[in-house]
Each structure stands twice: as C-alpha cells, then as structure tokens.
C-alpha cells in the first residue's frame, strides 16, 4: 500500500486489451458502466483471426447450418470430457449472436464482413466429423489498416480496429503500459477480487472495481 501513488475507482476494471478484454469492456460500457481497461503494452493486441460460431448471420446466409449438440459432443470428446459441458453449450447457444454483434461493429467502422465458404472449413474424406464453425472474415478499411502495426494480417486489422474504436466511442478509459501486478481480495485475501494494482515500480496505481474485475 505504501508504494501506491494513486487510487482510481470505476464500476468495472478489465485486465488485458486483447479480443476478449475489448469485447468485455465495450459491452459493460454500452450498458452504462464506467470502465477502465488495463493493457501492459502500448497498443491493443490480437493473436488469432479464426472466429468460431454457430448460426451467425453470415453462416446462415450461405446455408451453413451446424448441428449444435453434435458439435458440443465432439468438443467434449476431443478434450477427453475434461471440460465443462455447460460452458461449451453456452458457446454453442450464443456464439452466433456474439459474431453478429462483432460484425455490426466492424461495419460501423468501415470494415466489411463476409462469409467463409463451407468447403474452406471442412476436410473432404476425413474420418473425423468436421463442423463448419468458422463464422466470418473481414476486409479492412484503409483506416483500420493504417492503424494496425506493420505486418498485421488484414482480417486481424479489421477486428482490432473495430473493437478498439468501439471501446473508445463507448467511453472506455484505456490505460496502456499498465501491467497488472497484484489482485486485491476481500476478507484477508480469501474473498472476491475488488481491485488490481498495476503499473511500474515507483508508480503503482490501485484500480478499484465497485462492480467487478474482469481478467
């Protein structure tokens, strides 16, 4: 506590400026929450560009219909039934709506979503059943390409820009170069997480989330 130079309070604190963190931060802000997002680097970060979903508008547009229960069963089999089927089912039931939400954001910022042809998502002749869950790709706008670090894949540039700009427009307070170093918990470090200490030695800040901390 003696090393903390400032305490900042918001409704929600999100740790990490990747795809999940940006989506969480934007969703919370759009619901009226005051949100602070902490990112340890000097920019938002993305690693992948394959977005799996079931029954997104782009998939239905090309009549790509996936058997939800069969997909859930295959995912469970593939992970040797060590995963939580309720979580997998949550994805199967709601991923299409999430994909549509993301695509709407992308279109708002000048990027163009497009469906992925079914024959590009399954392997002919395989003995293992495949599921065409690759839901969409996006062509970036010129602004999105210019905003991305040099060498960024065009699809990734689209997603990166749409979610970052969406957060900015929703009022999310993005703090770059702000690595989380410690979580603060209630009840003598045994209860719920209520705050996060972030920053560099000599300039630590305590971010308190009155409604929640999202990792």
Q: Where are the model-predicted features located?
A:
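Short, solvent-exposed loop/turn and secondary-structure capping segments
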Residues: 46-50, 55, 124-126
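Flavin (primarily FAD) binding-site architecture
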Residues: 215
């Amino acid at each position: 506590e003696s090393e903390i130079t400032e305490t900042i309070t918001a409704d929600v604190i999100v740790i990490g400026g990747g795809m999940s963190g940006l989506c969480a931060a934007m969703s919370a802000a759009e619901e009226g929450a005051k949100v602070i997002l902490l990112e340890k680097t000097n920019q938002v970060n993305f690693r992948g560009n394959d977005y799996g979903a079931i029954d997104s508008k782009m998939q239905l547009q090309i009549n790509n219909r996936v058997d939800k229960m069969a997909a859930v069963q295959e995912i469970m089999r593939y992970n040797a039934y060590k995963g939580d089927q309720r979580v997998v089912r949550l994805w199967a039931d709601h991923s299409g709506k999430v994909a549509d939400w993301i695509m709407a954001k992308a279109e708002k910022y000048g990027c163009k979503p497009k469906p992925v042809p079914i024959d590009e998502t399954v392997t002919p002749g395989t003995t293992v059943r495949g599921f065409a869950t690759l839901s969409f790709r996006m062509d970036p706008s010129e602004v999105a390409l210019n905003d991305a670090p040099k060498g960024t894949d065009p699809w990734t540039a689209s997603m990166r820009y749409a979610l970052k700009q969406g957060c900015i427009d929703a009022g999310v307070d993005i703090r770059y170069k702000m690595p989380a170093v410690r979580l603060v918990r209630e009840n003598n470090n045994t209860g719920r997480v209520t705050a996060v200490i972030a920053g560099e030695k000599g300039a630590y800040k305590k971010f308190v989330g009155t409604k929640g901390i999202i990792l």
